[in-house]
């Protein structure tokens, strides 16, 4: 259930440097965890029992997302979770642009056996506590910074043209999924409305 978010982590990047990291534990509704998910992230029902619900936490986290350029590793999944949980609580989507560090990495470096966050972090000597949201966010940021430095990308707006990607967008009432640029210059993407827009 993609609306069942139990932790949110961010890393703020300014002038090519990570300047701030934060995370929030969240008590999902209902507060139940599949054993397989617990094995992945290590968070249990008891760990979040006293944590705020997403809508309460979002008042603190939203300013980091509004009018921001956002990056996630396997962004299609993370952004889907964000859309689902915002819709669950009838919260408006923030206005943001996003891209995927996984897709950037695949285009920035050839020949890696795996482009997962753990493998890339190990290869580049990035300290990572995998599946801890704050650490994942910081590692994702550092991977994108490295890719941009090596390919002389100086601005977020240049990522799409450099790596053959279309930026995704969230906005009030809908979203445009990130996509790959085709050889004919067109994009493979989806545009949708939420169907649940707060009044």
Model-inferred region functions:
Residues 95-105:
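A short, structured active-site edge motif that brings together acidic residues
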Residues 145-199:
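Acidic two-metal-ion nuclease catalytic site recognized across multiple nuclease folds
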Residues 1-96, 110-131:
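Conserved non-catalytic scaffold segment of RNase H-like nuclease domains
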Residues 133-147:
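Acidic, divalent-metal-coordinating active-site segment for phosphoryl/phosphodiester hydrolysis
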